[in-house]
Regions:
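Extended beta-strand/beta-hairpin segments
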Residues: 1-46, 57-81
Length: 81
């Protein structure tokens, strides 16, 4: 796996995965960003939730469950600096 992160403007970045998918990242306006993309820490939560959802779905399907809906909620709290 690999990923490439390229500065666009200000605090915005384009992130591109090894499979060619892209996402725009930015920091919050109160941290100097312009709210042009998802926050990097939010990406961590999405990655965790996505991996969990895919693993659960594969296990359910392996057990021959007919899954028509699946939702994973992930909450995180950033440590105080």
């Amino acid at each position: 796996m690999k990923a490439s992160i390229q500065l666009l403007e200000g605090s915005s970045f384009a992130g591109t995965s090894g499979s060619g998918h892209s996402v725009t990242l930015d920091v919050a306006p109160e941290a100097g960003g312009r709210n042009q993309g998802i926050r990097p820490m939010e990406m961590i939560l999405l990655g965790l939730g996505g991996c969990t959802a895919i693993d659960v779905l594969q296990m359910l399907r392996k057990g021959r469950s007919n899954v028509t809906d699946l939702r994973v909620e992930v909450n995180g709290e950033r440590a105080n600096e």
